[in-house]
Each structure stands twice: as C-alpha cells, then as structure tokens.
Amino acid sequence: MVTDNGSNYVAAGRIVSETYKTINWSPCAAHCLNLILGDISKLEHVAKLAKKASKITKYVYNHVYVLACLRKGKDWTEIIRPGATRFATTFIALHSLYHHMHDLKALVTSKDFVDSRYAKDRIAKEVVAIILENQFWNDCSIIVKIVEPLMRLLRIVDGDLKPSMGYVYEGMHRARLGIKKMFKNKRILYKPYTKILKERWDRQLRQHIHSAAYWLNPAFQYDQATFCNKPEVMAGLLDVIDSKATCSKSKLLAETRLFRDRLESFGLDLAISNCKSTQPDEWW
C-alpha cells in the first residue's frame, strides 16, 4: 500500500500495516523524490543557476525570430517540456538548455543575430552574456549530472509501465555514489547534495520493503560488480520475511539461498540471460 507523505496518511498507513500483517505500507517515492529535487533547487548556487537559465528560456520563447532560428537546427527538441513534477520540469529545462549550448552560442554570435534588433536591448545583452559565460555551462553540467539518476528514478516510480518497488533502493544508492564519484570523493563538495538525499531517505522513504525488493531483484542480485552488500539490505529482507511471511520462514530462507547462489532453476541459462530484460515480477 502506497500513500501520500502527509502525516495523517503516514499514521493511517502504519496502523493498517500493523493491524494486517500481510499488508506492507510505504510512503510515495515520487513525492519524496520531488521534495529532494525541491531541496536541491533551494541551494543558493542552484537557485542562481536556475534563475539565469530561466532568463534565457523566457527570452527565447518570447521572441519568435530567436525561437524560429533555433528550431531550424538538426534534431531540435523543445527546451520547455513537462515533467512528472514542478521541480522535475525545472531540471528538465536545465538539461535541455545544456543540450542546446552550442546552438545557443552559435545563434548569439551569428552576424544575422548581432545585426538584428533582437540583440540590442538590455535583456538581450544580459542573456547573451549568460550564454557566453563558460562558468554557467560548467555549473549546468554539474547539476544535470547530479539530478540525472534522480530524474531517471522519478520516471520509473511515477510511471505505470512496470512495478517500481524493486528499483527504489538501487536508484537512491546509485544517486549517492554518482554524486560522490563526480566530486572525486571530496566531502566538502558532495556533502550538500548527499545530505539532502540522506535526510529525505531516512526521514521519509526508507522502508525494509525497499531493501528486500532490491535484494530480490535479479537484475541487481546477479550483477556482483555493482550489487550493494550493506548489512541494511539483508536486514530489510529478513525483517520482511519475519514480519510478513505466512508460510514456513525456514523454507523461505532456504529459497533465498538458492536464488542468491543461482542454484536449481535459478541457475538456468534462460533465467540468467533474462534477469535484466524481464521485470522482476514476471521473472519470478
């Protein structure tokens, strides 16, 4: 059972889960991810970056000539595209803007634009200055890389194409590792971002069911190069078995060992070769 993250829903979900042992409650992952993106957008340097990006976007879409010139480019995609949430839309625009960096630079330095009336007013000059500012694009690149795994996870949990429970833990784990790697494990640089993820994850989203679903997802379990072996993962699985199982817990534990070690039917070539291309519920 998944509910909104409001305190009344949280209380109701816990009561139902405690009363009916076979029902597991979890807060809405999409809502939590939206709050994470919102927290990141409130960081001072990110807010300044978004403000500059918004100035470019508004200028482009408020001038038909400028927009028409850009749309002539090969493989053009709109800068403004709807996202699953308000904050997602902001970062999608930032990503799209970064994708069109060369198009924008080429436009504002072209003779046609420089000689046109669209380049003469104060706002146009401010926009051109931002577009030609290398630091702006460097900052864009960093933020886009930070939020990319979060945006990917948001699309999974907010969509209806596949059950998402088995991907939440891995998505959050990958996001934290990616941020640390990008900043070359320099704590002073990555901490503002990982702190946001940790606080939201610990306070709102962390549930044993996420760890259990991650452990039972063959796409991750059978990828030993990236599989997370933190004690909390196994602890989550054991807690779910202990609190929710209605059959023999000993048999369940025995089967988890067969699954982990790829024994019996779990070791068949068909099972192994399809573990990443087949949804966990279908694979099982």
Labelled PLM ranges:
Residues 1-284:
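Short alpha-helical patches at protein termini and domain edges
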